[in-house]
Design a protein with these regions (language model features):
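His/Asp/Glu-enriched short active-site or ligand-binding loop at hydrolase and phosphoryl-transfer sites
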Residues: 193-205
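Short, well-structured secondary-structure segments
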Residues: 49-64, 77-86, 109
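Mid-to-C-terminal alpha-helical segments outside catalytic/metal-binding sites
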Residues: 1-10, 15-52, 216-221, 234-266
């Protein structure tokens, strides 16, 4: 079985240790399963049997955007698909998105909690319009956050509003549509033509609910993801293998959906 992990994080070697320590110190229960570096991710992938990983950076300050996006070119490989970043409260985002599109980046990650913005506010619609026009993928951190945040910046009904206004925008709502808000997800967005990834759900969602949700939403819109380094990639792979899901559907979730969405060879 080929496997694409659609939701991973790394940091430059010189700051990875510091970044890991900062997050573990501010997030209850957080534990890293790699050292947060590119090599650490690759080692974890090897142990888990993962062929390819999507890296999702987050600019928590406007000054970080250019450095992160410039690193994308060096990260691109058969095994690594780096996404870019923007800082939504600046007016620089059209230039940043244009740059990412020109160098072949597949999409961007937005973290409404870390970046402190409400995704449904109309002042952010120009971002979605450009991404839709450029045919780039938008990954939202969706739902609550285990860190010191309110967790109301990307609720299921807000994701629905973004989709309704930009129906051709390729949206990935991380954490099965909304971390710890799966009742709302099932009510608001379960059957919309957007993708969910499975990251950071194994410990909390429950097998019965997970199986019900992927059946209702459609396995063709589910992407395997782990949120590495914060979750053990090998255990997440093993978990999905054990579920009572057909081999055909496991292939879709593990790699076929992501391969088609990313338009890559594997």
């Amino acid at each position: 079985m080929k496997i694409i992990d659609f939701h991973t994080h790394i940091w430059p070697d010189d700051i990875a240790k510091r970044a890991i320590e900062k997050i573990t110190n501010t997030t209850p229960g957080a534990k890293a399963f790699s050292d947060g570096t590119l090599n650490g991710l690759k080692n974890s992938m090897n142990q888990a049997g993962i062929n390819c990983a999507v890296i999702l950076p987050i600019a928590t300050k406007p000054t970080q955007v250019e450095t992160i996006n410039n690193s994308c070119k060096n990260l691109m490989s058969d095994r690594i698909v780096p996404f870019g970043t923007i800082y939504p409260k600046t007016k620089k985002f059209p230039k940043d998105i244009e740059y990412l599109a020109n160098i072949g980046v597949k999409g961007i990650k937005m973290h409404p909690e870390y970046q402190n913005f409400y995704i449904q506010e109309k002042k952010y619609f120009p971002i979605y319009e450009i991404l839709q026009h450029k045919d780039l993928i938008l990954v939202f951190h969706a739902g609550k956050d285990p860190g010191p945040f309110l967790g109301d910046h990307a609720l299921p009904d807000a994701i629905k509003k973004v989709h309704q206004n930009f129906p051709k925008l390729k949206i990935v709502a991380a954490h099965m549509g909304g971390w710890m808000l799966w009742k709302q997800v099932e009510k608001e967005i379960i059957d919309l033509p957007i993708f969910f990834d499975t990251s950071a759900t194994r410990r909390w969602i429950g097998t019965e609910r997970f199986l019900r949700m992927i059946k209702k939403h459609g396995t063709e819109k589910i992407l395997f993801g782990t949120d590495s380094p914060w979750f053990n990639q090998k255990k997440d792979v093993e978990w999905l293998y054990t579920l009572k899901v057909s081999w055909e559907d496991k292939e879709k979730i593990f790699y076929k959906n992501a391969k088609e969405l990313l338009k890559i060879n594997l």
